[in-house]
A protein has these predicted regions:
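Hydrophobic alpha-helical segments, chiefly the membrane-spanning helices
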Residues: 1-304
Length: 304
């Protein structure tokens, strides 16, 4: 029964995020908000809504291990599995902006997070610093996009009542789904005698990363495999700056020594991914296979 409820929680998270993005994007268009701002804020937040709901709910309920391991585990999964599978299906060229801006930012903020973890806690002040970094990053992206006149793909406009219904329904589903996932993950961890940190790094992290995986595979099958790298790196930046920042700002988090090791592994995987993408400005199929094998090795390390 616990597994069924956990699955229902994941479904509510993913579908709720879809409804929230669709309703919010439609409302923003009704209010004449530029498409680029919609793409860089609402859609970005919606994609990471499952991770946000789980980590914030975990922080509020005192399950610090899940709040942190969910983000770290999701980021490792995004970088190695999501990008790895898409590169293995069809190698792709890497975008110049991602190489010069997003990937270095991802490495830098992950290194900063490792430094913050050293003292065994993520304080409220550190959470606010991460949130300020998120605001600065989004501002820079919006300015850059408007300067280069880049527009995100237009979303469909729904009637105002329907847009509001989608937003409200999506938020309720995401919040309820997040509560369900945290509660059932804790029970499953207790039943099997494993740590919440382990459950957060595996089952919860993979479950909340499913939207990124599905979106990227669909894009790859349509011939736009390069989108996978942008999705993964953008999601990872958002997860660290906004989700961990918000979680710590709400409730300071205790950090296990294992979480510091996992964060260092995340940093190493980010550097390897950057080197793969930087060489010849492409991600080849063998590099994708190498990423997948690295994740298999990491999973084996968790089961040690």
């Amino acid at each position: 029964m616990e597994y069924l409820l956990l699955l229902i929680g994941f479904v509510l998270l993913i579908k709720g995020a879809d409804f929230f993005v669709e309703g919010s994007s439609s409302l923003a268009k009704i209010l004449k908000v530029p498409s680029v701002i919609i793409g860089l804020t609402i859609v970005a937040m919606g994609t990471s809504a499952p991770e946000a709901s789980v980590s914030i709910n975990a922080a509020l309920s005192g399950s610090n291990d899940i709040a942190i391991s969910n983000v770290v585990g999701s980021n490792i999964f995004n970088g190695l599995v999501v990008v790895g599978i898409c590169a293995f299906i069809a190698g792709f060229s890497t975008n110049r902006d991602i190489l010069k801006r997003d990937m270095p930012v991802n490495i830098i903020i992950t290194a900063i997070l490792c430094f913050m973890f050293i003292d065994g806690r993520l304080s409220r002040i550190e959470g606010i610093i991460l949130l300020a970094g998120m605001a600065a990053y989004i501002t820079c992206m919006i300015i850059s996009a408007l300067k280069n006149r880049e527009e995100a793909e237009d979303c469909k406009i729904m009637p105002l009542p329907k847009s509001l219904l989608y937003i409200a329904g999506g938020l309720i589903a995401v919040i309820f789904g997040g509560n369900l996932v945290v509660d059932k993950a804790c029970i499953i961890a207790a039943n099997f005698g494993v740590s919440q940190n382990f459950i957060g790094l595996t089952i919860v992290a993979i479950g909340t990363s499913l939207p990124e995986l599905v979106t990227s595979i669909v894009a790859t099958r349509k011939g736009d495999s390069g989108l996978a790298l942008g999705n993964a790196i953008g999601s990872n930046i958002f997860n660290i700056l906004f989700i961990l920042g918000m979680s710590a700002a709400i409730q300071p988090l205790h950090v296990l020594s294992e979480s510091l090791i996992d964060c260092i592994i995340l940093l190493a995987s980010g550097i390897v991914l950057f080197l793969f993408a930087f060489t010849k400005k492409t991600m080849s199929r063998w590099e994708g296979a190498a990423c997948i094998l690295m994740y298999v090795g990491y999973t084996a390390y968790l089961f040690r």
